[in-house]
């Protein structure tokens, strides 16, 4: 059972319009050797910013989330830049297709595709189809270079929610 403030926050998130985005976390799961579906029992916090999501690449690993139903909190925190972590949050019960980790520009990356249940086929399918790697690379590569060249001055603990496992 959720306490009142947690339930109020969840109710708020459900009212926020879903957004299609490529976002990031700073934790990857090194155990999969082949793609697999995973379910998120809790909220999944991701960020538009590689630097924020990884605490300036504290560990050289980036989880990439491709989805259509995350709730973008960035506009709500526009007036509070010190607290705006460019967060896109997925609701509890969201499913992802998790791919094995791979190397890219000296960083270990892991792709997660958000899934939805197709009512006709009763199979899970990606919510957003990308035509190849280009959209991911166009989002990721400049951010990796910028994070290495000019790390952000982040408050202590700002990235913590992006650095923990999904379970």
Model regions: which residues?
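Mono-ADP-ribosyltransferase
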Residues: 1-167
């Amino acid at each position: 059972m959720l306490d009142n403030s947690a339930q109020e926050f969840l109710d708020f998130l459900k009212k926020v319009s879903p957004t299609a985005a490529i976002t990031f976390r700073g934790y990857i799961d090194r155990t999969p050797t082949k793609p697999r579906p995973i379910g998120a029992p809790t909220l999944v916090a991701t960020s538009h910013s590689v630097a924020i999501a990884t605490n300036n690449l504290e560990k050289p690993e980036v989880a990439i989330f491709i989805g259509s139903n995350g709730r973008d909190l960035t506009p709500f925190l526009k007036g509070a830049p010190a607290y705006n972590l460019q967060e896109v949050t997925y609701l509890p019960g969201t499913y992802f297709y998790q791919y094995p980790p791979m190397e890219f520009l000296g960083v270990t990356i892991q792709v997660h595709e958000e899934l939805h249940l197709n009512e006709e086929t009763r199979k899970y399918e990606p919510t957003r189809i990308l035509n190849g790697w280009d959209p991911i690379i166009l989002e990721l590569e400049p951010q990796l270079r910028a994070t290495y060249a000019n790390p952000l001055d982040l408050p202590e603990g700002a990235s913590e929610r992006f650095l923990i496992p999904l379970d």
